[in-house]
Amino acid sequence: MNSLGFDKAPQDTRVVVAMSGGVDSSVTAALLKEQGYDVVGITLQLYDHGLTVGRKGACCAGQDIYDARQVADRIDIPHYVLDYESRFGQSVIDDFADSYLRGETPIPCVRCNQRVKFRDLLAQARDLGADCLATGHYARRVAGPTGPALHRGADPARDQSYFLFATTPAQLDYLRFPIGHLPKSETRALAERLGLAVADKPDSQDICFVPAGNYAQVVEKLRPGAVEPGEIVHLDGRVLGRHDGVIRYTVGQRRGLGIGGRRTPEGEELDPLYVVRVEPETRRVVVGPRTALARDRVLVREVNWLGGTDTADVPVTVKLRSAQPALPARVSLTADGGAVVTLTQPQYGVAPGQAAVFYQGDRVLGGGWIVRAEASPALADAPIPAGAGTAL
């Protein structure tokens, strides 16, 4: 059995590596080549955001394709660039824009993995006769009695399992994550040892089609005329100000509301207000005190369940945002393909459009998209101590 789990020699095992031009996927390809595998590199041309916003410099830019090709030449593997712009636009970018217009806060990287990399690219890898598709994700694929399971990456600071929750069992069977057991520092050290020019390349910080994080500009260009001004309204009905479009607000947001407020002589905000909900139909942004954000019940749709036959009242920990710690909860699947998540402690700022990802220990049991969060009757009637719960 070789290191990728196949009962044949590495040189007889063909591996397609998804090469983004970054250090993680470059090290993945180089390590597999060093181990003797038949490696083929593929880079996806997903989006030229310069056509939309007139700027350069994010993970899908031409420089990254050049970097991937340089690495492929260095380690002497075939390398192909596939034009996936059209399918990426339809499957990811349009969904991103429409999600914001619905008052949600989307995660396009999950949709990209779900609808492009692990669907279309995986099919392309099969067409090339590959035994598996390898990526540079910091996640682990662990063999189990009923098939492979998805686990967190070994480095908590780099774990990307949250973004992979939609991976199906069939996809997971074909995927490999060769650096999922490494810390990032070791990945960069390997890049240095292997002589890869990308060893010191900075990690991408932006969504590839949203340069400098200006997602509102992208949505406005993709959906001209759809972003309309409206009112900022307090829960008690007072109109506190106006906004330039609900796409600029997310549940739990405190800064940048532009409605002023009382402050201490030292400048500290008194009675701060938070976005409690976004109403795209009325074009209203509703704000209130932090206590109004308390929620302990989360409704989820499009659940991908990797947890086997247990589907009712399953004890889990759940992440409601990628950078948030996992929280104790219980989850029950529903007949419509969704789930109800009951939190042990109320949370503040649970945003529709984000993902709820379920874990048992390091294992990913699945996840889905947050539709809305609610306060149970018990929570709604209970006084909430100041500072209780976790701010998202």
Curated annotation (Swiss-Prot):
Subcellular localization(s) per the UniProt record: Cytoplasm
Catalytic reaction equation(s): S-sulfanyl-L-cysteinyl-[protein] + uridine(34) in tRNA + AH2 + ATP = 2-thiouridine(34) in tRNA + L-cysteinyl-[protein] + A + AMP + diphosphate + H(+)
A family per Pfam: tRNA_Me_trans_C
Residues of the site described as Interaction with tRNA: 137, 354
Location of region: Interaction with tRNA: 158-160
Principal subcellular localisation of the protein: cytoplasm
Enzymatic class: transferase
GO biological process, one term: tRNA wobble position uridine thiolation
Highest taxon, organism lineage: Bacteria
InterPro entries according to UniProt: MnmA-like, MnmA-like_C, MnmA-like_central, MnmA-like_central_sf, Rossmann-like_a/b/a_fold
EC id: 2.8.1.13
Disulfide bridge map: 112-208
Record-level GO cellular component terms: cytoplasm
Keyword annotations from UniProtKB, A to Z: ATP-binding, Cytoplasm, Disulfide bond, Nucleotide-binding, RNA-binding, Transferase, tRNA processing, tRNA-binding
Residues bound to ATP: 18-25, 44, 136
UniProt-recorded Gene Ontology molecular function terms: ATP binding; tRNA binding; tRNA-uridine 2-sulfurtransferase activity
Positions of the catalytic residues: 112 (nucleophile), 208 (cysteine persulfide intermediate)
Family as reported in the entry's similarity comment: Belongs to the MnmA/TRMU family.
PANTHER family reported for this sequence: MITOCHONDRIAL TRNA-SPECIFIC 2-THIOURIDYLASE 1 (PTHR11933:SF5), TRNA 5-METHYLAMINOMETHYL-2-THIOURIDYLATE -METHYLTRANSFERASE (PTHR11933)
Physiological role: Catalyzes the 2-thiolation of uridine at the wobble position (U34) of tRNA, leading to the formation of s(2)U34.
Descriptive protein name: tRNA-specific 2-thiouridylase MnmA
Organism listed in the record: Rhodospirillum centenum (strain ATCC 51521 / SW)
Lineage: Bacteria, Pseudomonadati, Pseudomonadota, Alphaproteobacteria, Rhodospirillales
